[in-house]
A protein has these predicted regions:
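Aromatic- and charge-enriched surface segment that lines or borders ligand/interaction sites
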Residues: 132-187, 307-310, 378
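Ligand-site clamp/hinge motif
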Residues: 249-254, 281-344, 480, 489-491, ...
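Alpha-helical secondary-structure segments
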Residues: 171-176, 207, 211-213, 261-262, ...
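Ligand/substrate-recognition segments at binding pockets and active sites
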Residues: 48-51, 85, 270-271, 289, ...
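Detector for C-terminal structural segments
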Residues: 23, 27, 36, 67, ...
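N-terminal lobe/hinge region of extracytoplasmic solute-binding protein
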Residues: 68-71, 81-138, 180, 258-260, ...
Length: 619
């Protein structure tokens, strides 16, 4: 569901449901759900897991001078330098409410800061960021948040008037404005809006204090409250009036970011690059959490081979790579032999004998799947859906596409989290069992042409794939081959990303292949609840409607006791496994290469945090 590590965007910045990304796009983007959440990694299971009731936690105002996160930074490190990375595609919008793509998440994560974040080494702990402190009452339904004073929005030049607008202080009213915009039914924020449907009210007590009252008890109410960001009223309604239609479609403002975070967007050349510079009045400087790197450049390069060559030539300092590149191209003398995994630091892998790059590897907090639109026949039949999964050779996909850099899964939770039921094994590749199910569903080759038919209709359908995505292309090619052997004709339509997303938003497709990033604490509501099935642009785009699932989801949301919630999640996992609305594919390893010139690098449970990086200096 990368916006990276500032509250689940550090794991996921705007809690938008599912930044959907595939293969190399995932490895390059900061984790965020599409229309929704920046994202649990492999080592969380190895950690002494503390599933805590974060909704009932309280923080007292911080009296120390530094943030608890300051221990991960090097405040005395030499400031300066340029950090160059690459992303696979540009975005249509940088609007923090309506933007829904991985690229937007990545840029926004650097330019703004939510009220709270997670501790980098102990992500079960919530820490203040733009907030100074908070208190909860009434079983987590009432949350009072105190903002830091002196936080400043970046200056900007108004795209309409051409007038320069200086820095302006952030207030609680800007956070209220963010929520008001999300909840405006005319704003294109359907997926994000669903997360706040149970928020009864939010008000600014004064310029620096907020009060939120949730209508229902919700185990993520504190987390969701701390995910909020201030939205600059003076930028989005310079005349004092809010126009939701203009907010959606104002391409000039939606190509800008006015945040209050560590970096300021200074240049965007469409389909070429983004340039960001350190914001010298960033409030994090006084807390010891200001980045040392002066400038960030994100090159937009569609071809993965071109990106890799740029890394080798020194044009890039860090790069997410495909499993194919990892296995075939990172074993040369330029690359350190030891791989950095969760808990390791760059200092643990000293470079020697001409080595220029370090390798970083950990499970991504995301999964890929093949989804079946249950509004379309024959995918309204769970016998057919189960047969489809039995005809998907996931072991072959893991081996040939991912080079065994990942894990096959059976359900919708992160596979190393306590919510995932490890007793439920993925269905095997079993064409014989699939044939029996299809026969039971009355599919047979009645005219001997090699294609199954039922009620005079052939078993022919179209699966969508994204142009220029080699991982997805390989997966669907393998699937097509196995389906053909079973008498099923799968056509493949290759679409550009905006067209692809448009098809999903309108539910105008039969089968798709996508991926979800996952928040730290999972809530299946947005992707799986029946109420989300008909939302245009919503995350339940496959139209999964199941009353038993709805009851479980609603119970999960209201259960604060961790062990009880885990049991409910495992029941939900079992139900999804029985229904097979998706063919769950793989949780991939997140594979990254970083230049030897980058220091203060650590692989945290939720991945790398490039804000901590130092160019030169000590490790």
């Amino acid at each position: 569901m990368g916006r990276k590590s500032k509250f689940e965007l550090f794991v996921q910045i705007l809690l938008t449901a599912a930044v959907i990304f595939f293969g190399i796009t995932l490895t390059n983007a900061l984790d965020r759900n599409r229309r929704e959440m920046a994202e649990l990694r492999k080592a969380i299971a190895a950690m002494p897991r503390q599933t805590v009731n974060i909704v009932q936690k309280t923080t007292e105002p911080q009296t120390e001078e530094k943030s608890a996160l300051a221990q991960y930074y090097q405040p005395d490190a030499p400031a300066g330098g340029v950090l160059r990375s690459a992303i696979a595609s540009d975005t249509g919008s940088l609007n923090p409410v309506t933007g829904n793509e991985a690229t937007a998440s990545a840029i926004l994560a650097m330019c703004t800061a939510p009220l709270g974040t997670r501790d980098l080494r102990h992500p079960e702990k919530l820490l203040p960021l733009s907030a100074e402190s908070w208190q909860t009452s009434d079983n987590g339904k009432r949350i009072n948040i105190k903002l830091r004073k002196g936080m400043m929005f970046h200056s900007f030049t108004d795209p309409e008037s051409g007038k320069f607008v200086p820095e302006k202080e952030v207030t609680a009213h800007d956070v209220v404005f963010y929520v008001d915009v999300i909840r405006n039914s005319q704003v294109n924020a359907g997926a994000l809006r669903s997360y706040f449907k149970d928020l009864g009210s939010i008000r600014a007590v004064n310029d620096y204090e907020l009060e939120l009252v949730w209508k229902e008890e919700y185990f993520r109410s504190l987390e969701m409250s701390l995910s909020l960001i201030p939205l600059p009223r003076h930028f989005y309604m310079p005349d004092g009036k809010f126009d939701p239609v203009k907010f959606n479609d104002d391409y000039r403002r939606n190509d800008m970011i006015v945040g209050h975070g560590a970096y300021k967007l200074v240049k965007h050349i469409k389909d070429q690059r983004y340039e960001l510079e350190r914001f010298e009045n960033y409030f994090g400087k006084a807390l010891g959490i200001a980045p040392a790197v002066q400038k960030r450049i994100l090159e937009i390069v569609k071809a993965d081979n071109t990106r890799f060559q740029m890394l080798l030539s020194g044009e890039l300092d860090m790069l997410g790579v495909s499993a194919d590149q990892w296995v075939k191209r990172t074993n040369g003398k330029e690359f350190a032999a030891k791989v950095i995994t969760v808990g390791d630091k760059a200092a643990d892998v000293p470079l020697q004998n001409g080595e220029k790059f370090r390798k970083v590897k950990h499970l991504a907090n995301a999964y890929f799947y093949i989804g079946y639109n249950q509004r379309k026949k024959p995918f309204d039949d769970k016998l057919v859906r189960k047969a489809m999964t039995l005809l998907c050779n996931r072991e072959r996909i893991l081996k040939e596409v991912y080079h065994n850099q990942g894990r096959i899964i059976s359900g919708p939770f992160f596979c190393d989290s306590p919510y995932y039921d490890k007793t439920i094994k993925p269905l095997p590749f079993d064409p014989k069992a699939a044939a029996e199910l299809l026969k039971k569903a009355n599919w047979a080759d009645r005219d001997g042409d090699g294609i199954l038919d039922k009620d005079g209709k052939k078993f022919v359908f179209t699966a969508l794939q994204v142009s220029g995505n080699p991982v997805q292309e390989k997966i669907l090619s393998i699937f097509k081959e196995d389906l053909a052997a079973a008498g099923i004709d799968m056509k493949i339509a290759t679409l550009e990303w905006p067209v692809y997303i448009g098809k999903l938003d309108k539910h105008d497709y039969e089968v798709c292949s996508l991926g979800w990033s996952l928040p730290y604490e999972s809530d299946p509501y947005q992707v799986w609840h029946s109420s989300q099935a008909e939302n245009a642009g919503g995350s339940n785009h496959i139209g999964f409607v199941n009353s038993k699932a709805d009851k479980l989801i609603e119970a999960i949301r209201k259960t604060f006791d961790d062990e009880k919630r885990i049991k409910l999640c495992k029941k939900f996992h079992k139900l999804i496994h029985e229904e097979q609305p998706y063919t769950f594919l793989v949780v991939p390893e997140r594979l990254q290469i970083i230049s030897g010139k980058l220091n203060n690098v650590e692989c945290f449970p939720l991945g790398l945090n490039s804000d901590c990086f130092v160019i030169g200096g000590r490790n």
